[in-house]
């Protein structure tokens, strides 16, 4: 069946902001779908609220709406654009749920829109647990024993059939949100209550526990003619009980017999047919009991998922692209496989002659109160993938690509510790982010494979592989560097040992080890990912390293630019940096360079095989980058675009003679090194908050007397504000110095005077060494003290006087020229009245670059890449700051709901995982839309609770006045209430949590409050009001922890409900006019 001609335009729903369980893999799939459908001549309309994505670039679709993915908003877009079809399978759970809402509210029927790729009934059958269970029974497949509950009463009924331990999962949520494992009645009650609340249909599935079973996934693609292929089988290294997004996974499956594999393959095809997935990709998850071999179907996703992004990168088969084409009527045998240059059709199942390992990346250091144990609710924020010829090689490459300080299986445990044995038992039995290292420690401690298997239930095949690596390490420890000959070195490198790990074992430097290895002529070769196990030739340069005879890299002699990516997503370094890397690659390719991308994150667009000319899927570490440079000999390497990951390498790369283009490593150091930066600020006669550096507790206490409290304290060289705190008195400073000095490895702790009530400003600029052009000035809505990545911001500024803005522009230009910036630069400043303070300067791509590019209609990342490659800003044609005639607001999205016990308060340490953007003619409209996009539902009436710190009291009356005028009842604690009463406004007093009951938390629990404005100062007041914020989160009450946030909410409420939707392309045309 060739493509359908009865549909002309297709609406694609994106996934919205990045949250735990739904990361940038949906930018990758959405961008692919846009490309594939436009290639076929369809008009593509895209909705996505996340500005940091490639898919929302104006060139990706015919009409782009950066609007909230809520059915009412999408209905307005459908009314305006009149698409013929809706493709809901590219935007994760968000898009599926929105599509079902549109169907339920009759919007699709009203405007005659057909759902393609999956229909409402299919989605419902796969997602609705009781229908899914029944469907599996109909085709003779077993599901875990289970029951459905819509209330606590029903839940107890199911419990009687299933027994403890049991697994609880809410329907229509993703990443296992709200679910968990219950071992007793108390836990059962808590998890069920949370799950019923979080499921949009108030429905729970309660399953028998399969903990310790082996878990597998099949990635399947099916077309209209019932052709099916398995793209990839994936095996979870961690057994059942850990969410598959948090498990280490390996492809292809390693421990299945051929017979088992065929049974599972047939079962997964039967599942797709029964559920009714006519076209596109799905993944089916299975559990197998290691003792009896009983196989059960756990679940299936009738959409492109995180696993399909992994399967696409693992095999080179572009699932999302193929799925989009199947949705418009093609069949698999009609589509070509790009990687083999069309030598094979898409109906050939990929064959792979290597092993892929994925390891998740967690961010528990950001949430010290969170439970770091892994269960059925997903907690990881990113992942890294590695390719090797064996499991040993690929797992060791993945471990070093994670960037958690490991160079391989580094020991975690001091084996001489008297507690060592009990720590080991606990760490092996209860899975955590670090379990895989403890497995290696268990073998060092002399445990047998059988013992470790009993504790972990990790398949013995994997355990034997790790035990073998530990034995190799023990052997290396007994040798000296000179006694390692070519044969042994070759054997160790084939098993994936990194230079850094071997150097540590031998007690030499990594540099010494590398030169010894080069002397022995032990060098990696590069193999291609070609979907066909080298059976057909391939023109696509998608490479991984290994130690063998034949190298398939075949580098060209063209001028090349190499871009280092950002590695795994984490809080503080996410999709924004990937966006910059992709734009750099596009710009360099347009200018005739051959582009080389180095990255190891399988979720991203940067690791797509056609984003750059050559892709090296390798860890972004010194060893791996230097080897690629040796083979490719690039003209220039870009390190400023991937966040802190490549920046950390720039000094060492420069020493090794790698040509780093753009801002010099020395200039980067001048901006990052505190003392050198201070000298520059003084030379330019600019102002910084009073500050000092301290290397010990005594120095810190002395400095604090000179500077005065409150203080911001932090270690030097960090991204995302790790281990940063605001302290208000000496006791807090002492405690911080005892806990934080370990973070700094001999580098000092920095103390800054904290600017209370200051307005924070973010500036992005581009410089070519001669002239500086401001990309944008953004005013933060939260005052200084909230990390810039967590603060909402407005472009253009909404209340910053013009003369202050002009002064900021001048100061930024001075600093850019003084530092000799070539490329992008980001500056953070604070404004207190007429005083402007420089807080920090980052001569690199910042996380606001994508947002700014969407607002001003010019890709700063592309402009800056061209400047780095040697053009002037005049030659690029970007010489004038663009100030848009509309307002854009960026709002951050947080993962607090996933971490019970974590305080949802904003401070100097970054906690957000993603962002959304709202656009309006006024600041109020843009802010209101951004809140909606972030799923913060602003209340329109009810009772507002206000309790603010001393410094905010002058503003409390104004906010209260606004709320009263909008029809709210205002309640406040005693001190705040006095201020409001003094202004002649009606207010009801309520007890603080420490003042006896009934107090404010009782009101929150009884759902008597609809809006909370609660600002704090100092450790004690934060601790006292913790239960207010946590309960507000659990009861889904709009809550802000800054007075400026309260003022902005009042502005948005005055604006009233959102009325218009705007096309990005029209907004940009309006700027150019």
UniProtKB/Swiss-Prot annotation:
UniProt region (Oligomerization domain), positions on chain: 404-553
Binding sites annotated in the UniProt record for Mg(2+) 1: 285, 299
Reactions that this protein is recorded to catalyse: hydrogencarbonate + L-glutamine + 2 ATP + H2O = carbamoyl phosphate + L-glutamate + 2 ADP + phosphate + 2 H(+)
Ligand binding (ATP 1): 129, 169, 175-176, 208, 210, 215, 241-243, 285, 299
InterPro entries in alphabetical order: ATP-grasp, CarbamoylP_synth_lsu, CarbamoylP_synth_lsu_oligo, CarbamoylP_synth_lsu_oligo_sf, CbamoylP_synth_lsu-like_ATP-bd, CbamoylP_synth_lsu_CPSase_dom, MGS-like_dom, MGS-like_dom_sf
Positions contributing to Mg(2+) 4 binding: 840, 842
GO CC annotations, alphabetized: cytoplasm
Residue span of region Carbamoyl phosphate synthetic domain: 554-935
Positions of Mn(2+) 2 binding: 299, 301
Domain MGS-like per the UniProt entry, residue ranges: 936-1073
Intrachain S-S bonds: none
Record note on cofactor: Binds 4 Mg(2+) or Mn(2+) ions per subunit.
Residue segments, region Carboxyphosphate synthetic domain: 2-403
Domain of life where this protein originates: Bacteria
Record's subunit section: Composed of two chains; the small (or glutamine) chain promotes the hydrolysis of glutamine to ammonia, which is used by the large (or ammonia) chain to synthesize carbamoyl phosphate. Tetramer of heterodimers (alpha,beta)4.
Biological role stated in the UniProt entry: Large subunit of the glutamine-dependent carbamoyl phosphate synthetase (CPSase). CPSase catalyzes the formation of carbamoyl phosphate from the ammonia moiety of glutamine, carbonate, and phosphate donated by ATP, constituting the first step of 2 biosynthetic pathways, one leading to arginine and/or urea and the other to pyrimidine nucleotides.
Recorded family membership: Belongs to the CarB family.
UniProt name for this protein: Carbamoyl phosphate synthase large chain
Native organism: Pseudomonas aeruginosa (strain ATCC 15692 / DSM 22644 / CIP 104116 / JCM 14847 / LMG 12228 / 1C / PRS 101 / PAO1)
Phylogenetic lineage: Bacteria, Pseudomonadati, Pseudomonadota, Gammaproteobacteria, Pseudomonadales
Encoding gene, per UniProt annotation: carB
């Amino acid at each position: 069946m060739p493509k359908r001609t009865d549909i002309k335009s297709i609406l694609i729903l994106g996934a919205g902001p990045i949250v735990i369980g739904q990361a940038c893999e949906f930018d990758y799939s959405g961008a692919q779908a846009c490309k594939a459908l436009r290639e076929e001549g369809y008009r593509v309309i895209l909705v996505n609220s996340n500005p940091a994505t490639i898919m929302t670039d104006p060139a990706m679709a015919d009409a782009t709406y950066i609007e909230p993915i809520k059915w009412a908003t999408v209905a307005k877009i459908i009314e305006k654009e009149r698409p013929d079809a809706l493709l809901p399978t590219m935007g994760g759970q968000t898009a599926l749920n929105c599509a079902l809402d549109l169907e339920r509210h009759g919007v699709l029927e009203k405007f005659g829109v057909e759902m393609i790729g999956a229909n409402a009934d299919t989605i419902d059958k796969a997602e609705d647990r009781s229908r899914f269970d029944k469907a599996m029974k109909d085709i003779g497949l077993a599901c875990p024993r289970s029951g459905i509950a819509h209330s606590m009463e029903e839940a107890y009924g199911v419990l009687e059939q299933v027994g403890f331990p049991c697994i609880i999962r809410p329907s229509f949520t993703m990443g296992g949100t709200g679910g968990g494992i219950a071992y007793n009645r108390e836990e059962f009650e808590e998890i069920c209550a949370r799950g019923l609340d979080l499921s949009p249909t108030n429905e729970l599935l309660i399953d028998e526990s399969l903990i310790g079973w082996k878990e597998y996934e099949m990635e399947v693609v099916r077309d209209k003619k019932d052709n099916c292929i398995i793209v990839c089988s994936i095996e979870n290294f961690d057994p059942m009980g850990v969410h598959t997004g948090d498990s280490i996974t390996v492809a292809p499956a390693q421990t299945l017999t051929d017979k088992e594999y065929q049974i599972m393959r047939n079962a997964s095809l039967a599942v797709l047919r029964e559920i009714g997935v006519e076209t596109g990709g799905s993944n089916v998850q299975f559990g197998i009991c290691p003792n009896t071999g009983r196989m059960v179907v756990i679940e299936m996703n009738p959409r492109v998922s995180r696993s399909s992004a992994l399967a696409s990168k693992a095999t080179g088969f572009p699932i999302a692209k193929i799925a989009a084409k199947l949705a418009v009527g093609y069949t698999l045998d009609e589509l070509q496989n790009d990687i083999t240059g069309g030598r094979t059709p898409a109906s050939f199942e990929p064959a792979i002659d290597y092993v892929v390992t994925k390891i998740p990346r967690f961010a528990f250091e950001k949430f010290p109160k969170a439970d770091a144990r892994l269960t059925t609710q997903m907690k990881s924020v990113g992942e890294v993938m590695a390719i090797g010829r064996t499991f040993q090689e690929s797992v060791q490459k993945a471990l070093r690509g994670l960037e958690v300080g490991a160079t391989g299986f580094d020991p975690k445990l001091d084996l001489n510790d008297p507690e060592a044995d009990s720590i080991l038992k606990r760490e092996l039995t209860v899975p955590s982010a670090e379990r895989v290292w403890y497995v290696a420690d268990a073998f060092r401690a002399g445990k047998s494979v059988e013992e470790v298997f009993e504790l972990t239930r990790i398949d013995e095949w994997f355990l034997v592989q790790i035990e073998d690596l530990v034995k190799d390490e023990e052997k290396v420890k007994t040798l000296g560097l000179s006694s390692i000959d070519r044969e042994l070195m070759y054997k160790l490198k084939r098993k994936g040992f990194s230079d850094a790990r071997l150097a540590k074992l031998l007690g030499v430097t990594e540099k010494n080890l590398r030169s010894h290895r080069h002397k022995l002529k032990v060098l990696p070769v590069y193999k291609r990912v070609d979907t066909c196990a080298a059976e057909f030739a391939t023109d696509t340069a998608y490479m991984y390293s290994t130690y063998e005879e034949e190298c398939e890299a075949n580098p060209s002699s063209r001028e090349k630019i190499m871009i280092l990516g950002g590695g795994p997503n984490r809080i503080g370094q996410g999709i924004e940096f990937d966006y910059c890397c992709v734009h750099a690659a596009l710009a360099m390719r347009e200018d005739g360079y051959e582009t080389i991308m180095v990255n190891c994150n399988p979720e991203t667009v940067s690791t797509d095989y056609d984003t750059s000319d050559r892709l090296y899927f390798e860890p972004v570490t010194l060893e791996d980058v230097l080897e690629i440079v040796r083979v490719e000999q690039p003209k220039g390497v870009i390190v400023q675009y991937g966040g802190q990951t490549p920046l950390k390498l720039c000094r060492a790369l420069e020493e090794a003679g790698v040509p780093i283009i753009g801002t010099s490593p020395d200039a980067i150091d001048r901006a990052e090194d505190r003392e050198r930066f201070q000298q520059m600020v003084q030379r330019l006669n600019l102002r910084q908050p009073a500050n000092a550096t301290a290397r010990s507790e005594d120095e810190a206490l002395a400095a604090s007397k000179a500077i005065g409290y409150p203080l911001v304290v932090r270690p030097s060289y960090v991204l995302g504000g790790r281990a940063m705190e605001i302290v208000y008195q000496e006791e807090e400073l002492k405690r911080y110095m005892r806990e934080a000095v370990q973070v700094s490895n001999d580098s000092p702790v920095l103390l800054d005077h904290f600017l209370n009530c200051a307005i924070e400003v973010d500036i992005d600029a581009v410089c070519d060494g001669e002239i500086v052009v401001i990309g944008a000035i953004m005013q933060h809505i939260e005052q200084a003290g909230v990390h810039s990545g967590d603060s909402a911001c407005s472009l253009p500024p909404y209340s910053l006087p013009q003369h202050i803005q002009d002064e900021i522009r001048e100061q930024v230009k001075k600093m850019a020229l003084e530092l000799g910036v070539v490329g992008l630069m980001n500056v953070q400043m604070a404004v207190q009245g007429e005083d402007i303070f420089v807080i920090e300067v980052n001569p690199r791509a910042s996380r606001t670059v994508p947002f700014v590019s969407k607002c001003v209609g010019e890709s700063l990342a592309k402009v800056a890449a061209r400047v780095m490659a040697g053009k002037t800003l005049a030659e690029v044609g970007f010489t004038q700051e663009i100030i848009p005639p509309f307002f854009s607001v960026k709002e951050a999205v947080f993962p607090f709901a996933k971490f019970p016990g974590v305080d949802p308060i904003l401070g100097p340490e970054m906690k957000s995982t993603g962002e959304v953007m709202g656009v309006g003619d006024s600041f109020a409209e843009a802010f209101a839309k951004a809140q909606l996009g972030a799923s913060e539902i602003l209340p329109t009436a009810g009772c507002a609770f206000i309790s603010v710190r001393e410094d905010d009291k002058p503003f409390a009356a104004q906010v209260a006045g606004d709320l009263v005028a909008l029809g709210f009842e205002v309640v406040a604690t005693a001190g705040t209430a006095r201020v409001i009463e003094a202004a002649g406004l009606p207010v009801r007093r309520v007890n603080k949590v420490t003042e006896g009951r009934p107090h404010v938390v009782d009101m929150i629990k009884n759902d008597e409050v609809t809006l909370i404005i609660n600002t704090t100062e100092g450790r004690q007041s934060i601790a006292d009001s913790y239960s207010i914020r946590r309960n507000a989160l659990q009861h889904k009450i709009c809550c802000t922890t800054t007075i400026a946030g309260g003022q902005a909410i009042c502005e948005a409420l005055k604006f009233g409900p959102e009325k218009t939707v705007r096309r990005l392309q029209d907004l940009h045309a309006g700027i150019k006019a």
